[in-house]
A protein has these predicted regions:
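Hydrophobic positions on the alpha1 helix immediately C-terminal to the Walker A/P-loop
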Residues: 41
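Extreme N-terminal, non-catalytic leader segments
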Residues: 1-26
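Gly/Ala-rich phosphate-binding loop of Rossmann-like dinucleotide-binding domains
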Residues: 46, 50
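NTP-binding/hydrolysis catalytic cores, primarily Walker-type P-loop NTPases
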Residues: 199-230
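Generic hydrophobic alpha-helical segments
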Residues: 2-6, 97-99, 142-149, 204-207, ...
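Conserved catalytic-core segment of NTP-binding enzymes
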Residues: 4, 105-202
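P-loop/Walker-type NTP enzyme "switch/lid" segment
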Residues: 25-36, 55-124, 189, 193-202
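Solvent-exposed amphipathic alpha-helical surface segments
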Residues: 9-13, 52, 152, 218, ...
Length: 230
C-alpha cells in the first residue's frame, strides 16, 4: 500500500512548533454520543494547528448545523470555497453531499462527525480520534461505537480514545480494559477541561501538542531536526 503521508518532523520539545506534513493528512473525530465532545475536540485540534503554523481545515461532516449557526452568530460570511474564518481557524460547514465546492489542499483536514460515527464506515482516514464521556451511563454508547468501528480502528495509521475531563490513570468503566487489549492499535488519552475550543489555555495547549505529536508518530514520523520544505 502506497503511503499517503511523508513527514518532516520536529523534535517534540516544549515551545517549538509542531511538525508539518509534506502531503495532506486526514484526521477523523467522532463522539460516542451527543455531548461526548467530538466537535469541541475537532475545533480545538484545527485551531491549535493553524495557530502553530500548520495549515488546517475543519470540515463539518455531520448534519448538526452548528458551524453555520456559529458563523451567523458571529456575523461571518464564507469565502469562494465555502469556508468561514473564525479566530484563525478555517471552518467548512456541512453543505450536504450533493454540493460541489471549490477544492482545497490544506496540510491537515480535521473531519468532525459529531456523534454520527456510522458515517465513518469505509472512509479510510489516516488518524481516528474517538471522543467519549467517562460516566457509567455512557458506557454502552462507547462499547457500541468501539465494536462498530473495529475495522476502522485497525486500519487507521493511528487510533485514539479520548476521555473527556479525566486525568491520567483513569481506565474507564466495565469492559474498557478488555477493549484496550482487543484493539492494541488504540491509544487511550485524557482530555483536560477547557471551555472554549478556540482558546484552550495552557493546559489545553499542552494536551493538543501531545496529541498531535502522538498522531505524527502513529503516521510514521520520526523526530529529526527541522529542514526547509522544498
Amino acid at each position: 500500500q502506497v503511503e499517503r503521508c511523508l513527514w518532516t518532523v520536529l523534535e517534540s520539545t516544549r515551545g517549538k512548533k509542531p511538525p508539518r506534513p509534506d502531503t495532506s493528512l486526514e484526521i477523523a473525530v467522532a463522539g460516542s454520543r451527543p455531548g461526548a465532545g467530538a466537535t469541541h475536540l475537532a475545533l480545538a485540534i484545527s485551531r491549535y494547528l493553524s495557530g502553530s503554523g500548520v495549515e488546517s481545515l475543519y470540515v463539518e461532516e455531520n448534519q448538526s448545523g452548528h458551524m453555520r449557526c456559529m458563523a451567523q452568530t458571529l456575523g461571518l460570511r464564507p469565502d469562494e470555497a465555502g469556508i468561514y474564518h473564525m479566530a484563525g481557524c478555517q471552518v467548512r460547514p456541512w453543505y450536504g453531499e450533493t454540493v460541489t465546492l471549490k477544492p482545497t489542499c490544506p496540510a491537515v483536514s480535521v473531519y468532525d462527525y459529531g456523534y454520527e460515527w456510522k458515517r465513518m464506515y469505509g472512509r479510510g482516514r489516516d488518524i481516528l480520534i474517538m471522543a467519549a464521556g467517562s460516566s457509567p451511563w455512557e458506557q454502552w454508547d462507547l462499547e457500541r461505537m468501539l465494536e462498530a468501528l473495529g475495522p476502522e480502528i485497525r486500519s487507521a495509521k493511528g487510533s485514539f480514545l479520548a476521555f473527556r475531563g479525566r486525568k491520567k490513570g483513569f481506565a474507564g468503566f466495565g469492559s474498557i480494559g478488555a477493549e484496550k487489549k482487543k484493539y492494541k492499535e488504540m491509544e487511550i488519552i485524557f482530555q483536560p477541561y477547557f471551555e472554549d475550543p478556540l482558546k484552550p489555555g495552557e493546559q489545553g495547549e499542552a494536551f493538543l501538542r501531545e496529541l498531535w505529536m502522538a498522531a505524527v508518530k502513529s503516521a510514521g514520523g520520526k523526530p529529526m531536526k527541522r529542514k526547509e520544505r522544498r
